[in-house]
């Protein structure tokens, strides 16, 4: 019974969520698009001509937002017109419905085959921005969840170190908890500028937050 009440409460909140309604109205696949939008508007992350990589992209709302930002013209229906000023590569182990002008690679970005496909798309170009909305399946066991979250952040950090331009940026999702300070410290070891971000689109009850790193200390 308690589980049913929780599910009913979540469904009620979800249906009445203004960001869910906005996403449905504006054609985004998830309300998460507005988290990236708010951070982008604050930090001016996405600019014309950039190479952007979206890790853990499915269902694709972050790639949609980035695509719309780089689209020719300023119309919300630009996706139907085609053409962007820049390159977006979305990666996920899960399938994703196509998005116009977005290169989607399904697979683990640590594997050589996927990295080879990525290199073919990039054509030798370094990446301006890596965005990651990856999140593990949380178990409710604090220590185990902290380790899973930190692991995903480590993967994003390693990817960024290998692919970012010296003045590039990495934005990742994490959660406040026992491992949060360690993640921030790892960012500080890798980036000259590190800042936490908590967009209004994040649910009030969620411990979700985002960390932004800019300008690699030790570019490759």
From Swiss-Prot:
<dbReference type="InterPro" id="IPR002877">
    <property type="entry name" value="RNA_MeTrfase_FtsJ_dom"/>
</dbReference>
<dbReference type="InterPro" id="IPR050082">
    <property type="entry name" value="RNA_methyltr_RlmE"/>
</dbReference>
<feature type="binding site">
    <location>
        <position position="133"/>
    </location>
    <ligand>
        <name>S-adenosyl-L-methionine</name>
    </ligand>
</feature>
<feature type="binding site">
    <location>
        <position position="60"/>
    </location>
    <ligand>
        <name>S-adenosyl-L-methionine</name>
    </ligand>
</feature>
<feature type="active site" description="Proton acceptor">
    <location>
        <position position="173"/>
    </location>
</feature>
<feature type="binding site">
    <location>
        <position position="62"/>
    </location>
    <ligand>
        <name>S-adenosyl-L-methionine</name>
    </ligand>
</feature>
<feature type="binding site">
    <location>
        <position position="108"/>
    </location>
    <ligand>
        <name>S-adenosyl-L-methionine</name>
    </ligand>
</feature>
<dbReference type="Pfam" id="PF01728">
    <property type="entry name" value="FtsJ"/>
</dbReference>
<dbReference type="InterPro" id="IPR029063">
    <property type="entry name" value="SAM-dependent_MTases_sf"/>
</dbReference>
<feature type="binding site">
    <location>
        <position position="92"/>
    </location>
    <ligand>
        <name>S-adenosyl-L-methionine</name>
    </ligand>
</feature>
<dbReference type="GO" id="GO:0008650">
    <property type="term" value="F:rRNA (uridine-2'-O-)-methyltransferase activity"/>
</dbReference>
<keyword id="KW-0698">rRNA processing</keyword>
<comment type="similarity">
    <text>Belongs to the class I-like SAM-binding methyltransferase superfamily. RNA methyltransferase RlmE family.</text>
</comment>
<keyword id="KW-0808">Transferase</keyword>
<keyword id="KW-0489">Methyltransferase</keyword>
<protein>
    <recommendedName>
        <fullName>Ribosomal RNA large subunit methyltransferase E</fullName>
        <ecNumber>2.1.1.166</ecNumber>
    </recommendedName>
</protein>
<dbReference type="InterPro" id="IPR015507">
    <property type="entry name" value="rRNA-MeTfrase_E"/>
</dbReference>
<keyword id="KW-0949">S-adenosyl-L-methionine</keyword>
<dbReference type="GO" id="GO:0005737">
    <property type="term" value="C:cytoplasm"/>
</dbReference>
<comment type="function">
    <text>Specifically methylates the uridine in position 2552 of 23S rRNA at the 2'-O position of the ribose in the fully assembled 50S ribosomal subunit.</text>
</comment>
<feature type="region of interest" description="Disordered">
    <location>
        <begin position="198"/>
        <end position="220"/>
    </location>
</feature>
<keyword id="KW-0963">Cytoplasm</keyword>
């Amino acid at each position: 019974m308690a589980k049913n009440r929780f599910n009913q409460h979540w469904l009620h909140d979800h249906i009445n969520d203004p960001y869910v309604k906005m996403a449905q109205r504006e054609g985004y696949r998830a309300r998460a698009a507005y988290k990236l939008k708010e951070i982008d508007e604050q930090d001016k992350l996405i600019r014309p001509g950039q190479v952007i990589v979206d890790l853990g992209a499915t269902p694709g709302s972050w790639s949609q937002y980035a695509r719309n930002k780089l689209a020719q013209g300023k119309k919300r229906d630009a996706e139907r017109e085609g053409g962007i000023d820049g390159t977006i590569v979305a990666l996920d182990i899960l399938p994703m419905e196509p998005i116009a002008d977005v290169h989607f690679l399904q697979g683990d970005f640590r594997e050589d085959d996927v990295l080879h496909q990525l290199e073919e798309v990039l054509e030798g170009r370094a990446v301006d921005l890596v965005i990651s909305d990856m999140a593990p399946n949380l178990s409710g066991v604090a220590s185990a969840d902290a380790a899973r979250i930190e692991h995903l952040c480590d993967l994003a950090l390693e990817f960024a170190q290998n692919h970012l331009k010296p003045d590039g940026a990495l934005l990742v999702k994490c959660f406040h908890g026992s491992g949060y300070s360690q993640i921030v410290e790892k960012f500080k070891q890798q980036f000259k500028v590190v800042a936490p971000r908590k967009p209004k689109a994040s649910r009030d009850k969620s411990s979700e937050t985002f960390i932004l790193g800019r300008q690699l200390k030790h570019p490759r």
